[in-house]
């Protein structure tokens, strides 16, 4: 069964990066990945499957890559024995003695420098992070970017089950008479594709229920959900009617 069932999302690393995941050597990468999954669920409202982490001898020692259903979607590298000094906040990493690179998420010019150069980098005004932070930040960005492809029928059903525990009337109104799970999945995927959080799932499902008599097209439904969510988002930031906080 395990041979048939394909892993949804995975991380593969070259052997030089394994020290980052070895807690006996002070590596906390696995804990950070768990934290990234938790933060993603809290921010985007989507339950993530377990992220498989393994070594791959075909990668260069300091390389890593993310896979979606077994297919590589991005590859990068970090230096486990150095820290990354980035040209942020007015700092200029090019003045430092190190190995030049580009930070993978923000595209910022950066320099891999020995840890003993951290203080000098900070004096130069650079932002300095450890290699595990670079990888986990990259992971978080990729998860958001690919969330719509990660969400499967089963994951959608799990979200519906969570809502059903608190709001059984809403779910029973929707399923199976108004729409099926596939329509809800594709509607949620449309929102996630635009990096719209689905954590306000009750509002989304209520909108689908309201509109289902008119249209069952996921594109139309997601557009209406986006508008409804936008109304609630604005209200959160209003200090008084029709006036946004400055």
Regions found by a protein language model. Give the residues of each.
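Membrane-embedded alpha-helical signal segments
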Residues: 1-246
């Amino acid at each position: 069964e395990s041979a048939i069932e394909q892993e949804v999302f995975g991380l593969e690393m070259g052997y030089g990066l394994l020290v980052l995941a070895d807690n006996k050597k002070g590596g906390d990468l696995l804990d950070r990945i768990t934290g990234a999954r938790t933060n993603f669920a809290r921010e985007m409202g989507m339950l993530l499957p377990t992220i498989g982490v393994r070594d791959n001898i075909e990668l260069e020692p300091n390389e890593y890559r993310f896979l979606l259903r077994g297919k590589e979607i991005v590859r990068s590298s970090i230096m486990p024995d150095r820290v990354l000094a980035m040209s942020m906040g007015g700092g200029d990493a090019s003045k430092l003695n190190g190995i030049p690179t580009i930070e993978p998420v923000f595209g910022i010019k950066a320099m891999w420098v020995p840890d003993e150069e951290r203080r000098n980098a900070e004096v130069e005004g650079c932002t300095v992070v450890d290699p595990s932070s670079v990888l986990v930040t990259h992971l978080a960005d990729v998860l958001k970017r690919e969330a719509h492809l990660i969400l499967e029928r089963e994951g959608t059903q799990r979200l519906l089950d969570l809502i059903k525990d608190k709001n059984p009337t809403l779910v029973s109104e929707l399923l199976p008479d108004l729409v099926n799970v596939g329509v809800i999945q594709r509607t949620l995927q449309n929102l996630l594709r635009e990096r719209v959080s689905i954590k306000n799932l009750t509002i989304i499902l209520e909108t689908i229920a309201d509109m289902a008599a008119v249209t069952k097209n996921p594109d139309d439904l997601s557009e209406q959900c986006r508008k409804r969510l936008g109304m609630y988002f604005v209200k959160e930031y209003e200090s008084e009617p029709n006036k946004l906080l400055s």
